[in-house]
Amino acid sequence: MISISLCMIVKNEEKVIERCLRSVKNLVDEIIIVDTGSTDKTKEIVHRYTNNVYDFKWRDDFSKARNFSFSKATKEYILWLDADDVILKKDREMFISLKKTLDTNIDIVMMKYNTAYDKNGNPTFSYNRERLVKNNNKYKWVSPVHEVIVPTGNILYSNIAISHKSVKKEYSKRNLNIFKKMINNGIKLDARQQYYYARELYYHGMYEDSIKEYRDFLNMDEAWIENKIDACIEISRCFYNINDYKNQIRFLLKSLEYDAPRANICCEVANYFIQKEKYDIAIYWYNAAINLKQDINSGRFENLECYDYIPYLGLCLCYDKIGNYKKAMKYNELLGKIRPDDEKYLYNKAYFDNLKNSIL
């Protein structure tokens, strides 16, 4: 059985830190907490779980803080989490099995990171992260913001999921401010940083600035294809928000220059044609989304709803609009099979029940 150090960086996380530590305490052999300046009860809470609590002066650089936490680890492997992450029961069971059986030739274990959920708690947005790494001084965090460990060596893809359960009500400007500080200090952003900088601008409603930075990103040869495809989606959404619908569809279709269409692209294109009331074309794209398969090892951001929920809902709408009520009801029933308590499904069901009664 391997031994594991949990390494975390925290600041003012009293609302969530105990939930996290409670979920992981029996999975790891050591807990390392690096505090970057808490003024609440965070440190008091973490001391209930570990004495390995270290202060680290915040320097607008997440990688430095995370690398400091890694430097304190003494076990064979390092697990990292954020304070608002939890490991659910079914994933804890898989984690224990992994810990008992992991081949020590494995350098990195990728785990799913679920970051959005439906009202029943089912994940709707997920991607892989380099979650468990060998403690051999080979793996270091890079980038001051949206930090990452570059995956190398022998990599295992696991079905274990880490669940991100944020309680924050507003999207912080912290990351955007770090990027702006880097730029003001003359630091040239690499492709990955350029992508995330443009995305931060989008999240803060700075659509024209975001478009410019995304376009610069698309011209970077070293940029990852999956990020380029996502950039096309975000540019399209920016244009939608400034009422430029011609460029909205233009950049959705530009994504096809990089690879075959992803399910989220298909759904975005279908939605565009719904706006144009071209329902037959929208039907084509929703069906294309349904026929695609998830690639769990791709590393890309996955909106899981684009493989079933969103296309079923869209097809129900489209077929209703063109008067094909039989097919509209069919897709609503498919919707109900995956989400029987969904408000949209129940609303549509009542609508179709009334429609059948009026026809009869």
Regions found by a protein language model. Give the residues of each.
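A conserved acidic beta->alpha catalytic loop
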Residues: S23, D35-I45, W58, D82
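Conserved donor nucleotide-binding strand/loop of the catalytic core
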Residues: E44-F68, K72
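Acidic helix N-cap motif at the loop->helix transition within catalytic regions
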Residues: K15-E18, D40-Y49, K90
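Short, well-formed alpha-helical segments that are part of the catalytic scaffolds
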Residues: C7-E30
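Catalytic-site signature of metal-activated, phosphate-bearing donor transferases
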Residues: K64-F70, L81, I87-D216, E222
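Short aromatic/hydrophobic "clamp" motif used to bind/position activated sugar donors
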Residues: I78
